[in-house]
């Protein structure tokens, strides 16, 4: 049943050059119809009160979400709030509007000639527009406006490509435990000298594509904190990993941004397609990609740090995740063949991990990273994220860590920092991070891709940077 639903919903495409314009047209039609049926009969002041109420409600919602709650450091964005305002306008039309005014002829909208005619007119109006029909029409209009807004916002960020992706059915997954073991114990396969590809001959049982599996990668001791509870990890296993004699494959630990989840890299970021294409060109070899959760919730930001408020997120990424990988997966244990990467908040986190613990990962990909870990402003971050402790903040800030690093601290560390060509908000962070990294002895380069702060950039970045990554991790 699930497979049938997935097969059908994969064909329901949500992205295209027409999406935003069609959604705008739908919203305009809904607003116009509701004006015609519910608000044009109102007195002028009451008509003006409808958009005014929508503006006030939207402003209050913005204040609560962006100022008081502030779940996402960079905010939801103008596009999100513009579409939210459109949906609120439709709701206000429904709640504050009415049908033809008492004393008006429903057919003409004009005044009736006599009071007796007025009663008859009201009866005719009730007959023509029964309450249930009006409720159904209003509900349909609100649903259409909401659907249009969600589709338009999705298109703006270049997010879910299909309905299957929204439902989490775009990429089939199986539990890791369901895979057959290639050896009696989860030991690391041996690896010869030189690039892995030079010592590898693809066996006859090599699958045509990799597998996507899920697993729980638990956090360790969280005593003394509010606790960090990561969501389930999603793992890409390349074709070579699925053979009877697994080679010693390198590891890429990958993170999404906020709000986001590990599945986003598969449902939106085309990770499997990218890695399958790389593997097809390299005899089935590709990194084992473990997409982990650095947040615990789409709307919680533990700042990739060990704090009483956020739990031990840093320890999770630097110790718990590597320990779990070497215990449960048959991979190359050499950390010089491991990398960590992420986008936006996850890109910042990748930089934090590398600058705090370069012994854990020697390679990084930071896609559209923030200049500093943030909850929306430096002082707010220090106060809310680190209990007012500036020293704790600086101990988790990549620029501060790199500036204070002794010579040789980052020997052998290298990475790429990438950005969207139209990402004006995050572009200013790149020069500061690059200069700070180079001054600290980190080998770093930058890459730019067409687009803003969205998945069009991040999926393109991964597809482009995987060749550099494969060479860096000793695959080729």
List each model region and its residues.
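Non-catalytic cap/lid and distal C-terminal segments of serine-dependent acyl enzymes
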Residues: 1-104, 116-476
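Short linear segments in intrinsically disordered or otherwise low-structure-confidence regions
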Residues: 108-109, 114-115
């Amino acid at each position: 049943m699930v497979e049938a639903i997935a097969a059908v919903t994969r064909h329901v495409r949500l992205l295209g050059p027409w999406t935003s314009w069609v959604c705008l047209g739908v919203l305009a039609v809904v607003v116009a119809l509701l004006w015609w049926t519910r608000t044009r009969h109102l007195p002028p002041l009451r008509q003006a009160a409808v958009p005014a109420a929508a503006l006030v409600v939207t402003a209050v919602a913005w204040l609560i979400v962006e100022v008081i709650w502030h779940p996402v450091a960079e905010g939801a964005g103008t596009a999100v709030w513009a579409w939210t305002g459109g949906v609120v306008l439709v709701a206000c039309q429904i709640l504050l509007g009415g049908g033809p005014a008492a004393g008006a002829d429903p057919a003409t909208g004009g005044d009736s000639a006599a009071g007796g005619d007025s009663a008859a007119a009201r009866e005719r109006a009730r007959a023509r527009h029964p309450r249930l029909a009006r409720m159904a029409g209003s509900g349909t209009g609100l649903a259409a406006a909401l659907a249009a807004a969600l589709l338009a916002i999705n298109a703006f960020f270049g997010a879910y490509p299909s309905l299957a992706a929204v439902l989490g059915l775009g990429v089939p997954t199986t539990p890791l435990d369901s895979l057959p073991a290639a050896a009696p114990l989860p030991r690391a396969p041996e690896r010869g000298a030189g690039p892995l590809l030079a010592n590898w001959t693809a066996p006859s049982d090599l699958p045509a594509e990799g597998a996507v599996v899920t697993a729980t990668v638990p956090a360790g001791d969280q005593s003394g904190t509010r606790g960090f509870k990561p969501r389930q990890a999603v793992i890409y296993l390349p074709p070579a990993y699925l053979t009877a004699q697994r080679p010693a494959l390198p590891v890429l630990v990958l993170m999404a941004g906020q709000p986001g989840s590990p599945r986003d890299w598969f449902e939106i970021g085309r990770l499997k397609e990218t890695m399958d294409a790389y593997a097809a060109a390299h005899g089935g070899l590709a990194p084992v990609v473990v997409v982990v959760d650095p947040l615990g919730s789409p709307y919680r930001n533990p700042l990739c740090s060990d704090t009483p408020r956020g739990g031990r997120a840093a320890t999770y990424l630097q110790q718990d995740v590597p320990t779990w990988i070497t215990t449960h997966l048959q991979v190359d244990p050499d950390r010089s063949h491991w990398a960590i990467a992420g986008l936006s908040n996850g890109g910042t986190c990748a930089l934090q991990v590398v600058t705090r613990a370069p012994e854990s990962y020697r390679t990084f990909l930071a896609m559209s990273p923030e200049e500093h870990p943030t909850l929306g402003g430096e002082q707010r971050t220090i106060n809310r994220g680190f209990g007012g402790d500036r020293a704790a903040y600086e101990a988790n800030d990549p620029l501060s860590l790199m500036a204070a690093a002794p010579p040789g601290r980052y020997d052998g560390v290298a990475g790429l920092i990438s950005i969207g060509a139209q990402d004006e908000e995050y572009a200013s962070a790149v020069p500061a991070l690059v200069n700070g990294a180079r001054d600290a002895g980190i080998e770093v380069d930058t890459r730019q891709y067409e687009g803003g702060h969205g998945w069009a950039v991040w999926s393109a970045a991964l597809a482009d940077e995987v060749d550099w990554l494969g060479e860096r991790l000793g695959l080729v």
